[in-house]
């Protein structure tokens, strides 16, 4: 017989010591963001599903769905706060100039990102809107480095990609939605044989480029390799040049830098530079 107090898998209580520690970090990080001009917003836990997925279906499978008892419409529990903050900037703030927003809160996902992670992770971050160019990206990178220092993470590894590379390839290939979803999964798994199988109907140039993306990860030398094997498309050339500029700008920082051109998470609602951060003190 199941214990009535048993929690679902990958969901847990946070006891006093952990809760106090998390709250201390939350306050320190939000104070840091406020000092740099980022205004705090609190999006709702629930939204209509079409609003949560208005910029793409990237998080659809991770989203818990319920029927609104008032309207009968399908609602979702947020699995990521980032699209919500983008919605707030686009539809509520109406600022034609630069907007800096910060956020913090729990999200809920149908499955954990790994067997070591919770399905109810706490998400905190800052978003910069209306300011394009390398200066904007460097501002966010610098703020993130300060955030990591605030929570005691030293010598992190920054893993960069520029989504214009992938989106340029698929835009000129006219790939159907279902195939694109399967290609995305194969890219995330770095399953080169599956990418080869899925792209058989594409023209030779783009097919070879998509297959090559899977193996294009490593240090800055990967960018030189990418220049050789990827099409001489203007958007791709600009993206690789941008990544080279980021590398030069951040070399003075106490971080390690790597690149993964097949890491296309969020490509449906993000554009430009994207990155992940890894540290010995964290799982991911």
List each model region and its residues.
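Auxiliary tRNA-acceptor-end handling modules of aminoacyl-tRNA synthetases
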Residues: 1-18
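Charged, compositionally biased N-terminal leader segments and the immediate start
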Residues: 1-6, 170, 175, 182
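Positively charged, Gly/Ser-enriched RNA/tRNA-binding surfaces
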Residues: 18-36, 47-50, 72, 82-95, ...
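Polyanion/phosphate-binding surface patch
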Residues: 41-75
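Acidic, His- and aromatic-enriched active-site or binding-groove loops in soluble protein domains
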Residues: 62-70, 174-200
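Short, conserved phosphate-binding/catalytic loop or strand-edge motifs used
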Residues: 120-124, 158-168
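Short glycine/threonine-rich loop-to-helix capping motif typified by GTGT followed
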Residues: 167-177, 269-275
């Amino acid at each position: 017989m199941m214990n009535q107090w048993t929690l679902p898998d990958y969901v847990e209580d946070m006891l006093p010591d952990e809760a106090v520690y998390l709250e201390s970090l939350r306050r320190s990080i939000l104070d840091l963001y406020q000092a740099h001009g980022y205004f705090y917003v609190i999006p709702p836990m629930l939204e209509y599903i079409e609003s949560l997925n208005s910029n793409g279906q990237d998080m659809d499978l991770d989203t818990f769905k319920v029927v609104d008892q008032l309207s009968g419409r399908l609602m979702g529990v947020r699995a990521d706060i980032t699209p919500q903050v983008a919605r707030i900037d686009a539809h509520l703030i109406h600022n034609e100039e630069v907007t800096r927003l910060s956020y913090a809160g729990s999200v809920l996902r149908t499955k954990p990102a790994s067997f070591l992670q919770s399905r109810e992770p706490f998400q905190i971050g800052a978003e910069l809107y209306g300011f394009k160019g390398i200066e904007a990206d460097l501002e966010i990178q610098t703020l993130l480095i300060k955030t990591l220092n605030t929570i005691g993470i030293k010598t992190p590894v920054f893993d960069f990609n520029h989504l214009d590379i992938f989106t340029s390839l698929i835009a000129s290939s006219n790939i159907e939605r279902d195939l694109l979803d399967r290609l995305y999964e194969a890219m995330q798994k770095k399953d080169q044989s599956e990418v080869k199988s899925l792209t058989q109907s594409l023209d030779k140039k783009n097919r070879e480029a998509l297959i090559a993306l899977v193996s294009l990860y490593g240090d800055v030398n990967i960018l030189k390799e990418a220049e050789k094997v990827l099409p001489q498309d203007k958007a791709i050339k600009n993206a690789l040049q941008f990544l080279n500029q980021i590398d030069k700008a951040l070399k003075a920082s106490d971080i390690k830098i790597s690149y993964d051109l097949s890491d296309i998470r969020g490509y449906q609602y993000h554009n430009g530079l994207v990155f992940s951060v890894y540290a010995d003190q964290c799982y991911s």
